Amino acid sequence: MSQSRLDDLFAYVEERCLWQFFSRTWDREENIEGVLNQVCRLLTGQEPLRGTPQERLFYADALAMANDVRERFPWASQVNKEEIAFLIDGLKSRLVDVTITRSTNRELNHHLY
């Protein structure tokens, strides 16, 4: 995996995507997985999942992100499906690490929420 490509994707998400900052750990995990799984499907030419309201919500965020990735990063159209999947998995891991694991926000896991 190209570290610079992963850095590009991470910088994009940090700058443009509010779904990574939902108020609870489980919300953040769900959004990171849901949106990025749909992004992966879109970037690899697979049909996105749209069977449930939640899948459609993830699809809406993923569609904007996938279009931006194609527009901003010329390499996105030059990599194969396996590399896209590998990059998205790396992005998920980095987002979980930064927004959940190393977060100092104590409300993420507060028992009253």
UniProtKB/Swiss-Prot annotation:
The keyword Ribosomal protein does not apply. Its EC number is 1.18.6.1. GO terms for molecular function: ATP binding; iron-sulfur cluster binding; metal ion binding; nitrogenase activity. Keywords: ATP-binding, Iron, Iron-sulfur, Metal-binding, Nitrogen fixation, Nucleotide-binding, Oxidoreductase, Vanadium. It catalyses: N2 + 8 reduced [2Fe-2S]-[ferredoxin] + 16 ATP + 16 H2O = H2 + 8 oxidized [2Fe-2S]-[ferredoxin] + 2 NH4(+) + 16 ADP + 16 phosphate + 6 H(+). InterPro entries: Nase_V-Fe_dsu, V/Nase_d_su. GO terms for biological process: nitrogen fixation. It is an enzyme of class 1 (oxidoreductase). Its cofactor is iron-sulfur cluster; vanadium cation. Hexamer of two alpha, two beta, and two delta chains. The key enzymatic reactions in nitrogen fixation are catalyzed by the nitrogenase complex, which has 2 components: the iron protein (component 2) and a component 1 which is either a molybdenum-iron protein, a vanadium-iron, or an iron-iron protein. This is Nitrogenase vanadium-iron protein delta chain. The gene is vnfG.
